[in-house]
Amino acid sequence: MNIEVTQIIINQVYSKIKEYYGKGSLDYPKLELHKDIYARLSGDEEAEGEHSTTSKAQYDDETNVIYIYYPNMVNEEDVIRSIIHEYTHYKQDHKLFKQYRDMYSYNENPIEIEAHKNEEDWQLFI
């Protein structure tokens, strides 16, 4: 999906997602669109790595930003699910992130289970 279409979807749904799920302990997170996770982290726009084609979105609790990797978005549903998933992480207790990551596999992590469950609400925002 290209950056323009992704941005249109974000413009249509993000305020609804914020209203539905409410505000967390931090200000509402900004959303930023990026081509690649490695390019974003390195500052080199051409950088790629093993997760370049699979990373869809990421919430960074230190910067309070949701990063969307638009080339990996398949369709509108994918964009909405990704925003909901990362917004759920914004709302969660950030102190538990590392603790749970050390205790559980990704699929057994209660933080990830909640985020995946919330993704099922995606049709509410169309």
Language-model regions, residue ranges each:
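Histidine-centered divalent metal-coordination motifs
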Residues: 85, 89
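Short intrinsically disordered terminal tails
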Residues: 1, 124-126
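Auxiliary, metal-adjacent structural segments of Zn-dependent hydrolase domains
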Residues: 2-66
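Secondary-structure transition/capping residues
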Residues: 24, 28, 98-99, 126
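Post-HEXXH active-site segment of zinc metalloproteases
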Residues: 77-81, 92-124
